[in-house]
Amino acid sequence: MKVQEEKDAILLQESGIYQEEIQEQMLQGQGSFDFPDGAHYEGEFDQGQMHGQGTFNWPGGEQYVGEFRNGKRQGQGRYLTGAEAEEVEYYQGEWNQDRYHGKGIFVWKDGSRYEGDFDEGNIEGRGTYQWSNGDQYSGEFRDGHKHGQGSYHWENGERYSGEFANGDLNGQGTYQWPSGQQYIGEYLNGIKHGQGTYWESDGSQYSGTFNNLKGNSGNSDRVSRS
């Protein structure tokens, strides 16, 4: 679930070239600038740098609309992929030094979306991730993976609340099935492992030690997406 790709960074290696060209003109205030490779910027300048509100269009169709500071995307802004993409994906939110940083929303081409915290271009902190198939996770993330406390809801009605590590069920948690079954206990890498209690839908229960037990009554309680 990492979202920071090279092109998403608006590679102002390219921008370094762009900035040199702009600075030669020493543009100031509102204006526009066309680059030799077909890129185009329209907005505010300060001492020869993109600074303030502006719109930057790349030759491939990508577009950024928002705030700039000293030639870099900084503040609030929206970035969309190129027109050649089968479906558009975009990021809307806060930026720092050309990276997603702070609060934001990222929507993928397949309709999956994440809303929450970003850090230096990665999903990091707290947020909600919704998959295109209807699954949803709300909770803590680290380096783009489910990590910490969170809740995962499957489209089939199953749900888990508890601890995650490296994208999987790890630690103490509660898993519930639509049929009324429930497990409260320890998990290791997505499977029941350690001390716990399992209730059948008829109310009968088992308490004790579970050893690499995956699923109950044909159901799987493993998170398949990181």
Language-model segments: residues:
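Eukaryotic acidic, serine/proline-rich intrinsically disordered low-complexity regions
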Residues: M1-E24
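Intrinsically disordered low-complexity regions specifically enriched for long asparagine
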Residues: A9, S32, S201, N211-K214
